[in-house]
Curated annotation (Swiss-Prot):
Stored CDD domains: S14_ClpP_2
Function: Cleaves peptides in various proteins in a process that requires ATP hydrolysis. Has a chymotrypsin-like activity. Plays a major role in the degradation of misfolded proteins.
Protein name as annotated: ATP-dependent Clp protease proteolytic subunit 1
Subunit-level organization: Fourteen ClpP subunits assemble into 2 heptameric rings which stack back to back to give a disk-like structure with a central cavity, resembling the structure of eukaryotic proteasomes.
Lineage: Bacteria, Bacillati, Actinomycetota, Actinomycetes, Mycobacteriales
Organism: Corynebacterium jeikeium (strain K411)
One record GO biological process: protein quality control for misfolded or incompletely synthesized proteins
A GO term, aspect molecular function: ATPase binding
Length: 188
C-alpha cells in the first residue's frame, strides 16, 4: 500500500498538469476518458500552440472511451506527444500510436501489445446480429486508423492483430507505432 495520501497524489497530478503533462496510468474507461478529455481541452484552451505530453502505462480498456480520447486529441489545435512506458496494450497502444507524428516515444523497457477489439454480446438473436455488425465496423475502423498511424496496410494490421501481438520498444518503432525510443527526457 502506498504511503501517499490521496491529496498528495492528486497534487502530483495537478503539478504535472501545470507542466502540460497528462498521465494515463490505468484501464481506459468512461471516467478516465472524461478526465483526460477535459485536461486536453483545458490545456489546449490555455495555449493552443504548446505541446501536450501524454504518458501512457495502460492495459487498454473500452473502445468507446478510448475513441473519445482519440477524437479529443485530434480536435485539439496543439500537438500531442505520446510516451509509452511500462505497458501500452490494446487501447493504450492505439492512443500511443495516435500521437502527433514525429512526437511518439517509447521508453526502452516499454511493452506494446496490439490485438483486435473484443466485446461481450448478449440478448436476442436480432440484438446479437446488430452487435456483431457494430463490432465488425469497429474492428475495421480501428485497423484503418492503426494503418494510418503506422504506415502498415490495413490487411497487415488485420492479420497482425488477429491475436495478441507483443512488441518491444524497438520493435514498436520498426512497426511504426512510435517514432523514437528514448532513455532520457532530454531526447524528446
Amino acid at each position: 500500500m502506498s504511503s501517499e495520501t490521496p491529496n498528495h497524489r492528486d497534487s502530483v497530478y495537478e503539478r504535472l498538469l501545470r507542466e502540460r503533462i497528462i498521465f494515463l496510468g490505468s484501464q481506459v474507461d468512461d471516467e478516465i476518458a472524461n478526465e483526460l478529455c477535459a485536461q486536453i481541452l483545458l490545456l489546449s484552451a490555455e495555449d493552443p500552440t504548446r505541446d501536450i505530453s501524454l504518458y501512457i502505462n495502460s492495459p487498454g480498456g473500452s473502445v468507446t472511451a478510448g475513441m473519445a480520447i482519440y477524437d479529443t486529441m485530434k480536435y485539439a489545435p496543439c500537438d500531442i506527444a505520446t510516451y509509452g512506458m511500462g505497458l501500452a496494450a490494446s487501447m493504450g497502444q492505439f492512443l500511443l500510436s495516435a500521437g502527433t507524428k514525429g512526437k511518439r516515444y517509447a521508453l526502452p523497457h516499454a511493452r506494446i501489445m496490439m490485438h483486435q477489439p473484443s466485446a461481450g454480446v448478449g440478448g436476442t438473436a436480432a440484438d446479437i446480429a446488430i452487435q456483431a455488425e457494430q463490432f465488425a465496423y469497429t474492428k475495421r475502423e480501428m485497423a484503418e486508423l492503426i494503418a494510418e498511424f503506422t504506415g502498415q496496410t490495413v490487411e497487415q494490421i488485420t492479420k497482425d492483430s488477429d491475436r495478441d501481438r507483443w512488441f518491444t520498444a524497438q520493435q514498436a518503432k520498426e512497426y511504426g507505432f512510435v517514432d523514437h525510443v528514448i532513455t532520457s527526457a532530454k531526447e524528446s
